[in-house]
Amino acid sequence: MRALETIATLREYRKSLKESVGFVPTMGALHRGHQSLIERSLKENSHTIVSVFVNPTQFGANEDFSAYPRPLEKDLALCEKSGVNAVFAPKIGEMYPYEAKQRLKLYAPAFLSHSLEGAVRKGHFDGVVQVVLRLFHLTNPTRAYFGKKDAQQLLIIQHLVQDLLLDIEIAPCEIVRDSDNLALSSRNVCLNATERKQALAIPKALEKIQQAIDRGEKACEKLKKLGLEILKNLEVDYLECCNHKLEPLKTIEPANTLVLVAARVGKTRLLDNLWV
């Protein structure tokens, strides 16, 4: 496996690849959810590149960029064991050669980025677009793999590729859950035993909503009320039913509905969702 730290070495490596390339962008602290993206890329492509880069532009003023976990050696070992061909782990100066005021400004589309996560974390998706577009230019992948757990991010990346006419297939990957049904997240390590039990209300609420939909319930207000009752002991940022343009829905639209939840357990903020 190649461990690449500079754009020059990545470009040289990329030029040597003649067949399909799968790309898995990450911020490190890899877990089984990331591993499932890697495994799918390995299955569908001749070569797989993983990036490990904690992107400063997607952190807000009140979010502790310096505290984000960076177990790079552990991440490299996981990638090598999985069969990844190359890992790109650049320093900030490689990805952002100019200071902020000299940088080209890129903005995520407002209709997808200003609600839900974008309302809570203002400017977050602008930072995501900044780094993902740079990584796409550098890796020039055939396919890029994103988890469905970060549903709003996935929709924004899909729109980015379509709007900028990029020849990249975006491959959405299913949510991976732990044995207790909690969606895997790098943030889960911040939960103590008591908080972990409390956090299980999130998948339970979504499961209850799915069961109601399966029984024929289509009214979004009723479904949200059902979920919020289960989440009553958590600090809920939002529980919403939206279509794939993130427009609020009054009734469920088959194959075009997302039920999105964000809630805080102690100091840890967790996301989960249903694709209906």
Curated annotation (Swiss-Prot):
GO cellular component: cytosol
Active-site feature positions: H34 (proton donor)
Keyword ATP-binding applies: yes
Enzyme Commission numbers on file: 6.3.2.1
MF (Gene Ontology): ATP binding; pantoate-beta-alanine ligase activity
Keywords assigned: ATP-binding, Cytoplasm, Ligase, Nucleotide-binding, Pantothenate biosynthesis
Binding site for beta-alanine: Q58
Major location category of this protein: cytoplasm
Binding site for (R)-pantoate: Q58, Q153
BP terms from Gene Ontology: pantothenate biosynthetic process
Assembly mode: Homodimer.
PANTHER family referenced in this protein's UniProt entry, alphabetically: CYTIDYLATE KINASE/PANTOATE-BETA-ALANINE LIGASE, PANTOATE--BETA-ALANINE LIGASE
Job of this protein: Catalyzes the condensation of pantoate with beta-alanine in an ATP-dependent reaction via a pantoyl-adenylate intermediate.
UniProt record similarity statement: Belongs to the pantothenate synthetase family.
Name of the molecule in the record: Pantothenate synthetase
Taxon lineage: Bacteria, Pseudomonadati, Campylobacterota, Epsilonproteobacteria, Campylobacterales
UniProt gene name: panC
